[in-house]
Curated annotation (Swiss-Prot):
Pfam families according to UniProt: NusB (PF01029)
Source domain of life: Bacteria
Assigned protein family: Belongs to the NusB family.
Protein name: Transcription antitermination protein NusB
General function of this protein: Involved in transcription antitermination. Required for transcription of ribosomal RNA (rRNA) genes. Binds specifically to the boxA antiterminator sequence of the ribosomal RNA (rrn) operons.
Keyword RNA-binding: yes
Tagged with keyword Lipid biosynthesis: no
InterPro entries (UniProt xref): NusB-like_sf, NusB_fam, NusB_RsmB_TIM44
GO biological process, one term: DNA-templated transcription termination
Molecular function GO labels: RNA binding
GO cellular component: cytosol
Length: 138
């Protein structure tokens, strides 16, 4: 089955919202996801990818954060929760999903920042991911 790119984009946006909620509440991510998806129109979301992101990121959160640290201009504690969640999604894709071109991961991170972040957060996300991509490039 071929997954449409916009289904993946929606999965990333939903994952971002779940990761943001999880970071603040520390609730069980799987239980929260079930409740979250009850309220969403799941028809146009890549549900499998959504679950892969939230489970993969929450289980590997410390290692993902460690991968990000060398590319950040400030500490993780100083990052906004939205920016942190976006970077976690992007770094997860860069390191764990070799089938996704790095340019796609970067672009999707920037688009999430434009949609959910503060006014200039897309510039920050772009800078961090560009630096990381130079090292990671596949």
């Amino acid at each position: 089955m071929i997954i449409k790119p916009n289904f993946r984009r929606k999965a990333r946006a939903c994952a971002l919202q779940m990761l943001y909620s999880w970071e603040i509440s520390q609730n069980n991510i799987k239980d929260s996801a079930i409740e979250f998806l009850k309220e969403k129109n799941k028809k146009n979301i890549d549900i499998i990818y959504f679950y892969e992101l939230i489970i993969g990121i929450t289980y590997n959160c410390r290692s993902i954060d460690d991968l990000m640290k060398p590319y950040l201009s400030r500490s993780l504690k100083e990052l906004g929760q939205i920016e942190k969640a976006i970077l976690r999604i992007s770094f997860y894709e860069l390191y764990k999903r070799k089938d996704i071109p790095y340019k796609v991961s970067i672009n999707e991170g920037i688009e999430l920042a434009k949609l959910f972040g503060s006014e200039d957060s897309h510039k920050f996300i772009n800078g961090v991911l560009d630096k990381a991509a130079l090292k990671i490039k596949r």
